[in-house]
Amino acid sequence: MQVKEESQLRKVPVYTLRPLCCNLAPSNNETVIMQASQFSAQVLSWYDKYGRKTLPWQIDKTPYKVWLSEVMLQQTQVATVIPYFERFMVRFPTITDLAHAPLDEVLHLWTGLGYYARARNLHKAAQQVATLHGGTFPQTFDEVAALPGVGRSTAGAILSLSLGQHFPILDGNVKRVLARCYAVSGWPGKKEVEKKLWALSEQVTPAHGVERFNQAMMDLGALVCTRSKPKCALCPLQNGCVATANASWAQYPGKKPKQTLPERTGYFLLMQHNDEVLLAQRPPSGLWGGLYCFPQFEDEDGLHQWLAQRQINADNLTQLTAFRHTFSHFHLDIVPMWLPVSSFTTCMDEGNALWYNLAQPPSVGLAAPVERLLQQLRVGAQV
């Protein structure tokens, strides 16, 4: 849902809010309750007028839908998630359908969304629900938090948004709103900073209307209190926000300490026979776990050795344009090496190999760089 015009948003009632103290215990519990009620009242008033209420997972809401959306939304924006969510719901209308599906198909539908461990955990969690809970999504915090890929905030979001249970949340959007409003210094990835933010989230979460409030906090962070260029003049918390008062929003939340990412090189072998290209499935865990990728080598010598062992002629081996793919912990410089072959019988003994048909793609999960190179091959970019 788009944010409405600035002139409209400024009509939201604003209250003066004295910041809660993150470092010292409040001297008066009544003061904290009053401040928290002011905070939640402002946020709820804003949400009733401007919050998002028609996202696909908000229609005919169920714990399964909310869980699926929350996992997809980790590290990913709403606009990107929507088409993936809709495809998943068509193919897997129930958690039992997801549990019984092959992992390859789940990874295939996830291709392009990134952070593939989420998809593997999603599949494991669905199987766990089918086995331990008879296909009914659990409804207690401990049971939900025990699912693979679900932490405290995600569990709280699932139960509060779908069932109205009283649990605070602390996703990236909520961290940003709280850190700015109460000037919580430091990177939220540090335990002591996260602890302060959790304490604030617990204090401001109202006893009633938690479903609307938690959604409102996520919307406020996504639509108004954005990472860059926040719309402070449109924020219902503007008069009580320390960062707004001090024009210091850029300082909050604190940034992750910079680190120099190591660089690696990977040679990808794009071996093509007519409309088919050789792919190999990665091991279940580790980098691109369970996805199909081109045979990969640390250097060109390793690639030539692999071809020689299989008596494959490398005379027509051609290097394509190299490019960089960045992971959270290193850069991978990918060097694609294209090789047309007249026969693929020498590679059929590869147990995890697949000849991928470019014209009729099989339903398997692909790493993003692999999908990019396959698309180039489809349009004849190797020539």
Annotated model-derived regions:
Residues 12:
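Active-site-proximal or metal-binding-adjacent scaffold patches in catalytic folds
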Residues 35-37, 42-233, 237-246, 250, ...:
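Catalytic cores of DNA base-excision repair glycosylases
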